[in-house]
């Protein structure tokens, strides 16, 4: 887990306002929402699976960088005082025996099924999109107001306990002349996936068709652009599926938890 640095007082109203909207039932992808505030993926597991996942994350830090872990039975996080992890994400997924059972904007009922749930908040690449935009690099899914495309690769994660699975990556088309800049900017945020894991040649990592992402929405790739791939916090959901985890709650891909922590806190 990454220790936060230079924490100070700042206006967290944009993050709180977004969470309040989601608590009231608004559903939307969170890319570009509350810019400047760190966003997080989430996976929630019964206590008897929590150590397996913590070890899985430790062994696969590029895809699963842990930002916070709750106490068993708690729906709170130190990353946003007063937030409720059961209601404050725009959309949740409920998993049973490794299969997606439902999507819901409120996970309170599912949460009540297990009194000892442990929540993990995982770094999200949306965090470094703001500095990329500020550097003049277009983020296509933000321009098109769609969800980021995410793909299941053929790259195995290192297993841990009962958990195994392949890495999931997110993709952003980047002009060939700006790929190095995108890698440099994102590389300054190792706690939220950091630099890309692959550039170009999607077939080399098992992606057959960029127009058919397993998660999220396809995006345009214009002439002169290169598909650039980052490790993605949906990787835990791939492990849930591959490992047949009996019960889990996760964020829906692209629908993150918005923290009160500034992006700059995770700048290396």
From Swiss-Prot:
Which SUPFAM superfamilies does UniProt cross-reference here? PSTPO5379-like
InterPro entries to which the protein is assigned, alphabetical: D-Glu_cyclase, Putative_hydro-lyase, UPF0317
For this UniProt entry, the molecular function terms from Gene Ontology, in alphabetical order, are: lyase activity
Recorded superkingdom: Bacteria
- State if Lyase is listed as a keyword: yes
What keywords does the record list, in alphabetical order?
A: Lyase
Q: Does the keyword Lyase apply?
A: yes
EC no.?
A: 4.2.1.-
The disulfide bonds in this chain are none
What Pfam family is a match, any one? D-Glu_cyclase
Matching HAMAP family:
Hydro_lyase
**Can you tell me which family this protein belongs to?**
Belongs to the D-glutamate cyclase family.
The name on file for this protein is Putative hydro-lyase Avi_5849
């Amino acid at each position: 887990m990454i220790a936060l640095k230079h924490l100070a007082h700042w206006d967290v109203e944009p993050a709180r306002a977004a969470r309040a909207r989601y608590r009231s039932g608004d559903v939307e992808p969170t890319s570009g929402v509350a810019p400047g505030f760190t966003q997080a993926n989430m996976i929630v597991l019964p206590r008897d699976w929590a150590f397996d996942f913590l070890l899985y994350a430790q062994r696969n830090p590029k895809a699963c960088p842990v930002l916070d872990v709750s106490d068993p039975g708690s729906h709170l996080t130190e990353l946003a005082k007063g937030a409720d992890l059961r209601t404050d994400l725009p959309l949740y997924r409920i998993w049973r025996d490794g299969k997606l059972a439902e999507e819901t904007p409120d996970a309170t009922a599912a949460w009540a099924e297990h009194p000892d749930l442990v929540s993990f908040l995982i770094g999200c690449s949306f965090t470094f999109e703001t500095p990329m935009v500020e550097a003049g690099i277009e983020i296509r899914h933000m321009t098109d107001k769609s969800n980021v495309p995410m793909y299941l690769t053929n790259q195995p994660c290192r297993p841990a306990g009962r958990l195994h699975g392949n890495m999931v990556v997110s993709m952003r088309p980047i002009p060939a002349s700006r790929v190095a800049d995108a890698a440099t900017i994102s590389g300054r945020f190792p706690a939220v996936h950091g630099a890309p894991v692959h550039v170009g040649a999607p077939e080399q990592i098992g992606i057959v068709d960029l127009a058919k992402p397993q998660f999220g929405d396809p995006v345009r790739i214009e002439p002169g652009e290169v598909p650039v791939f980052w490790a993605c916090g949906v990787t835990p959901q791939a492990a849930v599926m591959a490992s047949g985890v009996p019960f889990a709650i996760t964020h829906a891909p692209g629908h993150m938890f918005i923290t009160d922590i500034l992006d700059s806190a995770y700048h290396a």
